[in-house]
Amino acid sequence: MTSGVKKVVLAYSGGLDTSVILKWLQETYRCEVVTFTADLGQGEELEPARAKAQMLGIRPENIFIDDLREEFVRDFVFPMFRANTLYEGTYLLGTSIARPLISKRQIEIANLVGADAVAHGATGKGNDQVRFELGYYALKPDVRVIAPWREWQLNSRTALLDFAEKHQIPIAKDKRGEAPYSTDANLLHISYEGKALEDPWVEPDEDMFTRSVAPEKAPDEPEYVEIEFAKGDPVAVNGQRLSPAALLTELNRLGGKHGIGRLDLVENRFVGMKSRGVYETPGGTLLSVAHRGMESITLDREAMHLKDEVMPRYAKLIYNGFWFSPEREALQALIDSTQARVNGVVRLKLFKGSARVVGRQSPNSLYRLDYVTFEADSVYNQKDAEGFIKLNALRLRLGTIAKQKG
């Protein structure tokens, strides 16, 4: 149903999909279109998106390009990294964590301009449609959502290219003259999907990567980097205090220089199918390794293990789009409550694709040399271990005795 919409706010990147959607909304809904482009540190000039929107008939006052980099890292990336979050054991959720912020700002703009609908460019096969729309409905329950991929007949990238050519919409080309990979980029990562990557057996072309050198071509000498944490969040790199966005930018530079953070993954989408994606997350990988190293000497054992138990659930909530859900907020409160003592400095060694913790120190350290030393000590009576072991072995002994009796 295409009637009843007077003004719609479109999440607009200036790329193929959303440029076609912009024109399609104008033709199909005959409504006023407001474009919103989020600067999340994707590393590209955003003014062309403004120019393209104007070329397609959008009035200047209806074009919003917002710098959200600091908010993105401070309020979304850092809280997620406090949990050491990994989806299916490997994915650092670079795409997933950006969607709640985009949804939030899109709804704010809709309220500001009096729009009665919002629209996005996510396909009907992927996770992003769910992530965007769960955010919309959580923040504005009565909003109308337009999802063109679920309405139109343009059911392939070839069809989109034909539509763009017909309407003289300029589309970016890669260096071989073909339509580029489907990508998503922000300060945390860049992802690649489509084209040859749809065959999970095919190795990605090296010229696809933009944020990291090939590990085998990384410097032949290791580099050490120190990351300082305060209450679980990074605040400085090599002694220099930086804003959240600047800090992640610097970690991206360091990690990318040493070929760190590449991931080739087949993941389970929320909608039920498997998909293959290739990711570059250099700074996020350094941050993940360092934060875990910081927790290793500052967190109580059972608090750490509890975090490890809830982390997969927390990661699944973010991956599936439930950032604004009460259960995610409850888990966040638990996670944040563990971070007050996660303070100190972690030293990493970067070398040809690897990042290893080689040093850590904290004013809140629970590591006690006088207790763990292999040398003589006066604080720990090793005889105490005997009773501890026997008590923990009691159920095992009783179980075996019962089995022996038949």
Curated annotation (Swiss-Prot):
Its EC number is 6.3.4.5. GO terms for biological process: argininosuccinate metabolic process; L-arginine biosynthetic process; urea cycle. It catalyses: L-citrulline + L-aspartate + ATP = 2-(N(omega)-L-arginino)succinate + AMP + diphosphate + H(+). Disulfide bonds: none annotated. L-aspartate binds at T123, N127, D128. It is an enzyme of class 6 (ligase). L-citrulline binds at Y91, S96, N127, R131, S182, S191, E267, Y279. ATP binds at A11, Y12, S13, G14, G15, L16, D17, T18, S19, A38, G121. The keyword Transport does not apply. One of its GO terms (molecular function) is argininosuccinate synthase activity. Keywords: Amino-acid biosynthesis, Arginine biosynthesis, ATP-binding, Cytoplasm, Ligase, Nucleotide-binding. It holds the Pfam family Arginosuc_synth. Homotetramer. Belongs to the argininosuccinate synthase family. Type 1 subfamily. This is Argininosuccinate synthase. It comes from Rhodospirillum centenum (strain ATCC 51521 / SW). The gene is argG.
